[in-house]
Amino acid sequence: MRLIPLTTAADVGKWAARHIVEKINAFKPSAERPFILGLPTGTSPLEAYKSLVTMHKAGLVSFKHVVTFNMDEYVGLPTDHPESYHTFMHQNFFNHIDILRENINLLNGNAADTTAECRRYEEKIKSYGKIHLFMGGVGNDGHIAFNEPASSLASRTRIKTLTEETRIANSRFFGGDVSLVPKFALTVGVGTLLDAEEVMILVTGRNKAQALQAAVEGNVNHMWTISCLQLHAKAIMVCDEPSTMELKVKTVKYFRELETESMKNL
């Protein structure tokens, strides 16, 4: 596992965006051989999306031959609802880049048969071979995507019941009213994430410190699903200073020394 200990959330976004651009450009994608990118929603990736849009407008990267798969979507929330993940992705990213509409993949939380929808999503991912890079965030309780504590580390895309803690945390997007936050969501599984060639998790804020500590210094544990990344051959944690507050000083120092070159010129 790589840990990139940066200073601010803006630094995290810039580093993540630069890494994605480097990966896409090195891959040299084409219509016949697209780059497959997994994407999250929420507060953590906002700075990364801003930086990606800026780099695209500067001519540093094209998304014309990039296919995206999003991590999750609420069940029962209309696609055009201001807090749907469809709306989030288009407003914050897709509307500002040259990605082809047919290359955007988001789970349908209004599907009549959610089990069939999850199966379709898994099959479509497999039709491309694999996701080359999956960017994600992490919840206060260590969940990735909507794989809440005690999720199977072998799980695939499925419907999940959201914990009260997650709904309370997400109520800030619904005017602070927990009752407006959907109780269910469709989400890629832990196993789906682990199948990706590379997984990059963005960790920002003091409220994520316990999750980061569990991921880096703890044992692999289904109560902290983020810890599954210890099993991945190419996992990266990109974090700001507040999120490292629960890590041992020597842990942060160790990774800072290892990643000195990669953290330059942000």
From Swiss-Prot:
Regulation of catalytic or functional activity: Allosterically activated by N-acetylglucosamine 6-phosphate (GlcNAc6P).
Hydrolase as UniProt keyword: yes
GO molecular function, one term: identical protein binding
UniProt record, GO biological process: carbohydrate metabolic process; glucosamine catabolic process; N-acetylglucosamine catabolic process; N-acetylneuraminate catabolic process
Record-linked InterPro entries: Glc/Gal-6P_isomerase, Glucosamine6P_isomerase, Glucosamine6P_isomerase_CS, NagB/RpiA_transferase-like
Enzyme Commission number, as recorded: 3.5.99.6
Classification via PROSITE patterns: GLC_GALNAC_ISOMERASE (PS01161)
GO CC terms in record: cytoplasm
Pathway in which this enzyme or protein is active: Amino-sugar metabolism; N-acetylneuraminate degradation; D-fructose 6-phosphate from N-acetylneuraminate: step 5/5
UniProt key word Hydrolase: yes
One Pfam short name: Glucosamine_iso
Site description Part of the allosteric site, residues in chain: S151, R158, K160, T161, Y254
SUPFAM superfamilies noted in UniProt: NagB/RpiA/CoA transferase-like
Keywords: Allosteric enzyme, Carbohydrate metabolism, Hydrolase
Lineage top rank: taxon: Bacteria
Quaternary state and interactors: Homohexamer.
Function per UniProt: Catalyzes the reversible isomerization-deamination of glucosamine 6-phosphate (GlcN6P) to form fructose 6-phosphate (Fru6P) and ammonium ion.
Matches recorded under NCBIfam families: nagB, PRK00443.1-5
Protein name: Glucosamine-6-phosphate deaminase
